[in-house]
Each structure stands twice: as structure tokens, then as C-alpha cells.
Amino acid sequence: MKYQPLYDRVLVEPIHNDEAHGKILIPDTAKEKPTEGIVVMVGGGYRNDKGDITPLKVKKGDTIVYTKWAGTEIKLESKDYVVIKESDILLVKS
């Protein structure tokens, strides 16, 4: 992939928890947004109060939980991703 998130941005591949709903078809517009994903790439960091670059705490491959309305949904190379700020990440699964 030829892309790189900037600053404190994180590229996340959402994990869709598709649950069986019997024979009821739920349209995409009514489905819950995923709030869990796998970190694909991280930006170089953010500037702290002293002007220094502080690296991000998450790393490629981390499974994370993020806020429901975080980030921007994008499609790269026919795959769905979300670009979020590190501050929108609530948990890192260990």
C-alpha cells in the first residue's frame, strides 16, 4: 500500500461483527457501525507542548476499540478502512 497516515492519524481495518438475524434482511443503512478494528498503519506522531514529535502508542497489528462515530470511512484498493485520531481509541486489546 502506497499511503501513509499523517501526524496522529491511524488507518484501521474495521472488524464487522455480522450477527445472524434469522431470515430478516437488515439494510446496510440500518446496521451498527463497527467500533473494533485492526491497526494497518500509524502516522509519525503529534507535536507536544514543547514542539517535539511524540510517537503514537498503537502499532501495526494492534486490535483496538474506538468511539462509534470516530474518523472518516474510506476505500483504498477496494477495501474499507477508517482513518481515526489516536485520541479516539478507547482500548487496545492484549
Curated annotation (Swiss-Prot):
Which is a Gene Ontology cellular component entry for this protein?
Answer: cytoplasm
UniProt cross-references to PROSITE patterns, sorted A to Z: CHAPERONINS_CPN10 (PS00681)
Subcellular localization(s) per the UniProt record:
Cytoplasm
The processes (GO biological process) annotated in the record are:
chaperone cofactor-dependent protein refolding
Which keywords, in A-to-Z order, does the entry hold?
Chaperone, Cytoplasm
Which GO terms fall under molecular function for this chain's record? ATP binding; metal ion binding; protein folding chaperone; protein-folding chaperone binding; unfolded protein binding
Q: Which SUPFAM superfamilies match?
A: GroES-like
Q: Which SMART domains match?
A: Cpn10
Predominantly, its location class is cytoplasm
The domain of life for this entry's organism is: Bacteria
What does the annotation say about its assembly with partners? Heptamer of 7 subunits arranged in a ring. Interacts with the chaperonin GroEL.
- What is the recorded function of this protein according to its Swiss-Prot or TrEMBL entry? Together with the chaperonin GroEL, plays an essential role in assisting protein folding. The GroEL-GroES system forms a nano-cage that allows encapsulation of the non-native substrate proteins and provides a physical environment optimized to promote and accelerate protein folding. GroES binds to the apical surface of the GroEL ring, thereby capping the opening of the GroEL channel.
Give the protein family. Belongs to the GroES chaperonin family.
- Which HAMAP family is this protein grouped with? CH10 (MF_00580)
* NCBIfam families with a match to the protein in the record: PRK00364.2-2 (NF001531), PRK00364.2-4 (NF001533)
Full protein name: Co-chaperonin GroES
Report the source organism.
Orientia tsutsugamushi (strain Ikeda) (Rickettsia tsutsugamushi)
